[in-house]
Every structure is written in structure tokens, then in C-alpha cells.
Design a protein with these regions (language model features):
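N-lobe entry segment of adenylate-forming
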Residues: 1-111, 115-118, 122-125
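Short polybasic/polar patches that bind polyanions
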Residues: 49, 128, 156
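Conserved AMP-binding/adenylate-forming core of the ANL superfamily
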Residues: 80, 98-153, 170, 174-175, ...
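Glycine-rich phosphate/diphosphate-binding loops that line cofactor/substrate pockets in enzymes
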Residues: 89-91, 127-132, 176-184
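Structural core segment of the AMP-binding/adenylate-forming
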Residues: 157-200
Length: 200
């Protein structure tokens, strides 16, 4: 980080190089947007084919109970499988999956897909050992550290529903969100480093 405040960067536009554009998944956003406008279901069905599904969908979009739309009805998918698991038996196994840098830029931690998988599985096993099952709600109240990613992915892996609460919120605000969501578990830390200050 350069130490510049984000609000001082408002209005600045960064254009990717031609090399980056050539390797992008979307070459021309205008054509892509028009495709989505003219054939919404076909567009999203094509995008969905990029993921691994445990069970394919019966219908891309169920509009029978507007405005309560249902996407990919009948399908089964796990986002962790698509984010991590499917890469473990490929050349990506030892490629970078997560790069974390501390707020002050003095510390950096990196995780390959293999290492990220190990951390997520460790978290998932701890959560399961604490009695959390599919459909249970988990509140995550962590500072901006890699463990927040591990916790979110661990919840998704076992089918638990997670709610991330900003680490700068007060205990009253946290309690209200825990009560409202009927959370069974709180994942937290003993302190946070936010905007150059330690909060405990």
C-alpha cells in the first residue's frame, strides 16, 4: 500500500493493459451485457456451465412467484468445491489462491490452493466438533485477517449459514445481529487492528 487514503483516489480510473484484456474472461463487456439483456436465462445457463455441479438444474429461473425468484431450481452445488476442491488435482494445486497483506503493509501471508484447503478443512472440522451442522447459523466477527476467509469457506463447506459482522461494530450491535440471526456460534478474535489502532 502507498499509504494514500482511499477517498483521495476517488475518480481515478485504471485501465488494464492489452495483455490483461487478452487474458480476461470477458473480452468485450458491451457484447456481454447485450447478451444478458436479450437472453437472460441462456446467458446465465452458459455462465453456470463454468462451475462444477453435483446435480444440474431443472430450470434456470423460476419466475412463478414474483418477486421471489428462484435460480437454478433442483441443482446442487458447493461453492467451496468450485473455489478450492476442483483445483487440488490440477496444475493449480500449488498456485496462489489467497494473498493477504496487513493494513500497514508490513506483513504478508500467501496460501496456495493446497494450503487454503488445509486451513478451510481445519476450520470446518473445528466447527463441526462444536456441534454446527448444515443449516445452522454462524456469526463471524473477525478483523481483516486470513482466518476470516477460512471461516467463511469452512461454513460454506459444511452447509452452515454465515454472517460476517464488521469488526468495528460495538458489542450491542454484534449482540443484536446474533440474536436476529439466531446464530449458534460466534467466531471472533481477542483484538483487531483497524485504521492503525488496536481494538480489544
Amino acid at each position: 500500500m502507498t499509504g494514500r487514503k482511499l477517498n483521495s483516489m476517488e475518480g481515478e480510473v485504471y485501465y488494464p493493459s492489452s495483455e490483461v484484456i487478452a487474458q480476461a474472461n470477458i473480452q468485450n463487456w458491451e457484447i456481454t451485457a447485450e447478451s444478458a439483456r436479450t437472453d437472460l436465462q441462456g446467458f446465465w445457463a452458459e455462465r453456470a456451465e463454468e462451475l462444477d455441479w453435483f446435480q444440474k438444474w431443472d430450470k434456470v429461473l423460476d419466475e412463478s412467484n414474483k418477486p421471489f425468484y428462484k435460480w437454478f431450481t433442483g441443482a446442487k452445488v458447493n461453492i467451496v468445491h468450485n473455489c478450492i476442491d476442483r483445483h487440488l488435482k490440477t496444475w493449480r494445486k500449488n498456485k496462489l489462491a489467497l494473498i493477504w497483506e496487513s493494513e500497514d503493509g508490513k506483513e504478508q501471508r500467501t496460501f496456495s490452493y493446497f494450503a487454503l484447503n488445509r486451513e478451510v478443512n481445519r476450520f470446518a472440522n473445528i466447527i463441526k466438533a462444536m456441534g454446527i451442522n448444515k443449516g445452522d447459523r454462524v456469526t463471524i466477527y473477525l478483523p481483516r485477517i486470513p482466518e476470516i476467509v477460512f471461516a467463511m469457506l469452512a461454513c460454506a463447506k459444511i452447509g452452515a449459514i454465515h454472517s460476517v459482522i464488521f469488526a468495528g461494530f460495538s458489542t450491542d450491535a454484534l449482540q443484536g445481529r446474533i440474536d436476529d440471526s439466531e446464530s449458534k456460534l460466534l467466531i471472533t478474535a481477542d483484538g483487531s487492528w483497524i485504521y492503525g489502532k488496536i481494538f480489544e
